[in-house]
A protein has these predicted regions:
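FIC/Doc superfamily catalytic core
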Residues: 1-349
Length: 349
């Protein structure tokens, strides 16, 4: 069975590239605390939007969908779930809110992880949450011809409980020793969790919830304001490539954490960059909302959509964004391209 020796593995991760990523995130975290102290009112808007985006994105990655209108209503608890997909979305909302509010009191022990999984399925019919898998599972992929092949074979069902106990104990020991940077330890734990794949269903969503939990416990709370899940969704292909590269040879303890760790550090940096960008716009009270929209467009290379602007300006209504875009088109400042859902805008050169 796989062993987890984080102290030994860490030496292989201290490459110039990863060290540079760590330095960048540490610098962002230093500024994070200043932003949090100075902009309390503006941050609530970001939290509300990120909650909706995170819940939607993490479920969409797993093929669980609902409309944007229904998603917002479910996350804001203004609607009850109508089907299985919405039940799972509502469950994700509950666990995400729990982590937001109580992360300091939630330790990633096996029984706690099972309780979080139980809550993930708290709206679902049938007792499928909270229990480890009762059958072996295979991570498969389908090629262009429709043929399936095994991408990864996780830990067998009968070894799952022991593997989770070993994983969590090794992780807790490394966390408490405080020798390994927690920015490295977190994605290492998440990779090993995914390689065990302890549940029949919900492993991907649990991995993203656990990522937020561990980052929050380490003091990196950017995921509360910027949706890490949405950033992962937007780079899903790269995510799966990094996961596959790092999981190969895992059963023989011959795998490398580097691709997966590098990917996750890049996601965190992207989140911090977006966080600082949005805060700057939110606190710029002297600039009108239409001028803020125009400023964002002026700094964007290539196309930008209405949805992009709504994500970057969560305090500006959809109507204001639509009117501003229409006005800028009439002025000749931007050009409208595409139609329907594919509509986007490009700044006229």
């Amino acid at each position: 069975m796989r062993t987890f020796n984080y102290s030994q593995e860490i030496q292989n991760l201290l490459t110039p590239e990863i060290v540079q990523l760590l330095t960048c995130i540490h610098e962002h975290k230093g500024r994070q605390d200043l932003f949090l102290e100075a902009n309390t009112d503006e941050l609530k808007t970001l939290v509300d939007v990120a909650m909706i985006q995170s819940t939607g994105a993490s479920n969409r990655i797993e093929g669980i969908f609902t409309s944007d209108k229904r998603l917002e209503a479910l996350v804001r608890k203004k609607a009850e779930p109508h089907n299985r997909s919405e039940q799972e979305i509502a469950g994700y909302r509950e666990v995400l809110a729990l982590i937001h509010e109580n992360h300091d009191y939630i330790s990633p022990a096996p029984n706690v992880i099972r309780q979080l999984h139980r809550d993930l399925y708290s709206y679902s019919t049938g007792a499928i949450g909270g229990d480890y898998k009762n059958a072996d599972n295979v991570i498969a992929e389908t090629d262009a011809q429709g043929h399936q092949r095994a991408r990864f074979i996780p830990v067998p069902a009968f070894q799952t409980a022991d593997a989770m106990d070993s994983l969590c104990q090794s992780f807790q020991n490394a966390w408490q020793e405080n020798i390994i940077d927690k920015l490295l330890l977190t994605p290492m734990f998440i990779l090993d969790f995914l390689c065990i794949h302890p549940f029949n269903d919900g492993n991907g969503r649990m991995s993203r919830l656990l990522t937020l939990l561990l980052l929050y416990r380490a003091g990196y709370i950017v995921g509360k304001y910027i949706s890490l899940e949405m950033l992962i969704e937007k780079t899903k292909t790269t995510y799966y490539e990094a996961l596959q590269a790092s999981s190969f040879g895992g059963h023989e303890n011959q795998n490398t954490y580097a691709p997966f760790v590098t990917y996750y550090l890049g996601i965190i940096i992207k989140a911090y960059a977006e966080f600082e960008d949005r805060i700057q716009y939110l606190v710029t009270k002297k600039i009108s909302k239409p001028d803020r929209i125009k400023a964002i467009i002026s700094q964007t290379l290539g196309k930008i959509s209405k949805k992009d602007l709504m994500e970057r300006c969560p305090d500006i209504s959809q109507g204001t964004i639509e009117r501003t875009l229409s006005s800028l088109v009439k002025e000749g400042y931007i050009i409208k391209v595409g139609s329907g859902p594919a509509t986007a805008y490009i700044r006229k050169q």
